[in-house]
Amino acid sequence: MAKEKFSRNKPHVNIGTIGHVDHGKTTLTAAISAVLSRRGLAELKDYDNIDNAPEEKERGITIATSHIEYETENRHYAHVDCPGHADYVKNMITGAAQMDGAILVVSAADGPMPQTREHILLSRQVGVPYIVVFMNKADMVDDAELLELVEMEIRELLSEYDFPGDDTPIISGSALQALEEAKAGNDGEWSAKIMDLMAAVDSYIPTPVRATDKDFLMPIEDVFSISGRGTVVTGRIEKGIVKVGDTIEIVGIRDTQTTTVTGVEMFRKEMDQGEAGDNVGVLLRGTKKEDVERGMVLCKPKSITPHTKFEGEVYILTKEEGGRHTPFFNNYRPQFYVRTTDVTGSITLPEGTEMVMPGDNLKITVELINPVALEDGTRFAIREGGRTVGSGVVSKIIA
């Protein structure tokens, strides 16, 4: 049976859920899908379906990013449910990079928690431009004053990280109650709150101006081998357009390779082309699965080149933000997360700078052990021992 063609009749926006573990991110994702499915705007995905990677079952926490799609009257959304647990912040960095806006889930019963702060900070770092807040578990809070207090705390926290806290839409509700209502076939007050949330997302998160006219670039997230068809790489197209038949390069980590695109798919539907913002699978002619890995990029030939040495403008987190407690010195060797990969690199401090304190903002020179596709403006996170200690942006390529 031929695959159904993907229709592009509404503006497309990438969003996702972020927030502290157990505040209800996955339940909210399921509730949105359930409430919208009653209006014919989504396929119903239940909680277990969204929370479905094998590792999660043992620990009861979400690890992999789950993608679901749904529509409102105005838009088509691709929604990622981001991992919440601190151990999996690494995935959050690659997941959050896929969002035009985020729904921050905060339990009204608990208020903002350490990971709430960390996810707001990460959103700032990886360039999530807009946040809408869902104050979950409001059914567990009887005191209206307490709700107001939590709302104030959330607004202050957003403002602290340069998000417009005072203007951010905050909708309170209960994802679990809405999910139960929708499953029972009812449209009650809790489902109405989900519709309020989607209305806020529709109006507050602008339709992104897609970088479709720039040169094609797609960071590789995953690589699959499909028997009889070849190698498929998946990821979100960062900019430009890719068409079936295009000649493209695979850049980073190893020597640059050239290949031809033989297929483009989105949500299991075939397309003639993929464009900036789309989460796609790209079929590559004659490329072996072992020649490609996460962290490489697909790009228009000669448009971006692999580099190992650059200058970057960085901010080093304070210990309160979850960063280092102590300074670091010249030749410090952390991991650099660029797009979808981590590469070890050494930091050279500017002349006259002996050490860097948590909270400092400075220009550094970085030398990576493996080449990565880089250009001015490429963002990266600095991590060590499983936690983010800094964030930065490439200001100048050296080699």
Swiss-Prot record:
Reactions catalysed, as given in the entry:
GTP + H2O = GDP + phosphate + H(+)
Organism the protein comes from: Campylobacter fetus subsp. fetus (strain 82-40)
Query: What lineage, starting at the top, does this entry show?
Result: Bacteria, Pseudomonadati, Campylobacterota, Epsilonproteobacteria, Campylobacterales
Region annotation (G3) maps to 81-84
Region annotation (G2) maps to 60-64
Protein name in UniProt = Elongation factor Tu
Cross-referenced HAMAP family:
EF_Tu_B
Q: What does this protein do?
A: GTP hydrolase that promotes the GTP-dependent binding of aminoacyl-tRNA to the A-site of ribosomes during protein biosynthesis.
Matching entries from InterPro entries are given as: EF-Tu_GTP-bd, EF-Tu_GTPase, EFTu-like_2, EFTU_2, G_TR_CS, P-loop_NTPase, Small_GTP-bd, T_Tr_GTP-bd_dom
Q: Where is this region: G4?
A: 136-139
Q: Might you give the EC number(s) for this enzyme?
A: 3.6.5.3
